């Protein structure tokens, strides 16, 4: 199935982007796609019809095709036994898309479609690039890394093959298979101005981000902790389907006198980060990258059941450099956020210093590094 959007522009090369499921996969893919589109590349997307890419990708102006695939980890014995047949079917579907689109480069940014799509690209001899956003690589990318032409990572030392160079701060050559490029963020983050240490005489702006799908623990517990603080302004992104319940919770806790706003989705994320003095959030790879790029202090509450505990590992890349706080979800539920907030709000200059440390760890040119890799693969194939 394909949703095609016509274009009169002259295209030089074609990129097939495989990404979907959550904003952590889709938005980095869109950032790369937009950058290459501006260089006259034709962009086609491979995803699944039931996830957010089916809505976001056409809205961004890109063609998308769908394959039938879903996750297999933790889904019970029957689904596990059926998985090989579903994967084979999805690979065949992906081969059909590749045959139709004829991409010069295929890039997997994560999500269900990346596995079958990556195998199909390899079988058809197409240059395959992987981008692993998380500090702990997922099972699919660990397997696909063996057949990929390039493996790009959002964090240093994600794969064993790159640990030594990344630990020593080396920028490896273009010929290296494994390269630390950072996580692509939307173009608007480049315009965010660094915060200055001058003391915050106004109320402290607190931004709560539950991710593109929302976060139940943050939605239920953060308003309770914020109700005990003074001199704050609050913006809370609660995720689709949670607006009424979270709004009611703030109404009960802060009332009409409190300065708070609840939204299902934040359209202008760079503006929200620019506004914030402190962010309370999960620790998905994209969120950590956006926190660093924005130069804002953050309290990370990793999803406790994330595969391979990758969210904790993501957060630690900043926390280990005193560029963020780590709060386990069980500590959040037990009221640990209240005391941590009190300490943060009492030291506004410390928040600025923490944000500046985070910004120094960001790779603000991640999009350019990824697109450069795609260009090199095309040149090599010519």
Curated annotation (Swiss-Prot):
Residue sites binding UDP-N-acetyl-alpha-D-glucosamine per the record: 22-24, 134, 186, 212, 285-290, 311
Subcellular location: Cell inner membrane
CDD domains: GT28_MurG (cd03785)
GO CC terms, sorted: plasma membrane
UniProt keyword terms in alphabetical order: Cell cycle, Cell division, Cell inner membrane, Cell membrane, Cell shape, Cell wall biogenesis/degradation, Glycosyltransferase, Membrane, Peptidoglycan synthesis, Transferase
Major place of residence: membrane
Enzyme Commission no: 2.4.1.227
Lineage: Bacteria, Pseudomonadati, Pseudomonadota, Gammaproteobacteria, Alteromonadales
Cysteine pairings via disulfide bonds: none
GO BP, one annotated term: carbohydrate metabolic process
Protein's name in the database: UDP-N-acetylglucosamine--N-acetylmuramyl-(pentapeptide) pyrophosphoryl-undecaprenol N-acetylglucosamine transferase
Physiological role: Cell wall formation. Catalyzes the transfer of a GlcNAc subunit on undecaprenyl-pyrophosphoryl-MurNAc-pentapeptide (lipid intermediate I) to form undecaprenyl-pyrophosphoryl-MurNAc-(pentapeptide)GlcNAc (lipid intermediate II).
Gene: murG
Topology within the bilayer: Peripheral membrane protein
Pfam families linked to this entry: Glyco_tran_28_C, Glyco_transf_28
Keyword Cell membrane: yes
Family stated for the protein in its record: Belongs to the glycosyltransferase 28 family. MurG subfamily.
Pathway listed: Cell wall biogenesis; peptidoglycan biosynthesis
Classification via SUPFAM superfamilies: UDP-Glycosyltransferase/glycogen phosphorylase
GO molecular function: UDP-N-acetyl-D-glucosamine:N-acetylmuramoyl-L-alanyl-D-glutamyl-meso-2,6-diaminopimelyl-D-alanyl-D-alanine-diphosphoundecaprenol 4-beta-N-acetylglucosaminlytransferase activity; undecaprenyldiphospho-muramoylpentapeptide beta-N-acetylglucosaminyltransferase activity
Keyword Nucleotidyltransferase among UniProt keywords: no
Reaction catalyzed: di-trans,octa-cis-undecaprenyl diphospho-N-acetyl-alpha-D-muramoyl-L-alanyl-D-glutamyl-meso-2,6-diaminopimeloyl-D-alanyl-D-alanine + UDP-N-acetyl-alpha-D-glucosamine = di-trans,octa-cis-undecaprenyl diphospho-[N-acetyl-alpha-D-glucosaminyl-(1->4)]-N-acetyl-alpha-D-muramoyl-L-alanyl-D-glutamyl-meso-2,6-diaminopimeloyl-D-alanyl-D-alanine + UDP + H(+)
InterPro entries registered for this protein in UniProt: GlcNAc_MurG, Glyco_trans_28_C, GlycoTrans_28_N
């Amino acid at each position: 199935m394909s949703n095609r959007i016509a274009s009169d522009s002259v295209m030089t090369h074609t990129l097939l982007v495989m990404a979907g499921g959550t904003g952590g996969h889709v938005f980095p893919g869109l950032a790369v796609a937009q950058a290459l589109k501006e260089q006259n590349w034709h962009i086609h997307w491979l995803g699944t019809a039931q996830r957010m890419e089916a809505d976001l990708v056409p809205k961004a102006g890109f063609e998308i095709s769908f394959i039938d695939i879903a996750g297999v980890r933790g889904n019970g014995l029957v689904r596990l036994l059926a998985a090989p047949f579903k994967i084979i079917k999805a690979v065949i579907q992906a081969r059909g898309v590749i045959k139709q689109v004829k991409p010069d480069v295929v890039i997997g940014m994560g999500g269900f479609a990346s596995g079958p799509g990556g195998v199909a690209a390899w079988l058809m001899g197409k240059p395959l690039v992987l981008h692993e956003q998380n500090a702990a690589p997922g099972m699919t990318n660990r397997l696909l890394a063996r057949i990929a032409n390039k493996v790009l990572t959002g964090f240093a030392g994600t794969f064993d093959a790159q640990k030594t160079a990344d630990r020593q701060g080396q920028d490896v050559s273009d010929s290296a298979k494994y390269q630390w490029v950072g996580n692509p963020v939307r173009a608007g983050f480049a315009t965010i101005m660094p915060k200055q240490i001058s003391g915050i005489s106004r109320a402290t702006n607190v931004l709560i981000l539950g991710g593109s799908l929302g976060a139940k623990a943050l939605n239920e517990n953060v308003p309770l902790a914020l109700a005990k603080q003074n001199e704050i302004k609050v913006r809370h992104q609660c995720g689709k389907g949670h607006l009424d319940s979270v709004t009611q919770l703030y109404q009960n806790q802060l009332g009409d006198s409190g300065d708070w706003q609840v939204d299902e989705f934040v359209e202008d994320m760079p503006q929200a980060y620019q506004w914030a003095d402190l962010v309370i959030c999960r620790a998905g790879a994209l969120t950590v990258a956006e926190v660093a790029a924005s130069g804002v202090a953050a309290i990370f509450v990793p999803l406790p059941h994330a595969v391979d505990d990758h969210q904790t590992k993501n957060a630690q890349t900043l926390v280990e450099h005193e560029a963020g706080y780590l709060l386990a979800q069980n500590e959040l539920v037990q009221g640990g956020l209240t005391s941590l907030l009190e300490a943060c709000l009492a030291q506004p200059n410390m928040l600025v210093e923490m944000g500046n440390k985070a910004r120094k760890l960001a790779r603000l040119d991640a999009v350019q590094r990824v697109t450069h890799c795609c260009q090199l693969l095309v040149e090599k194939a010519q």
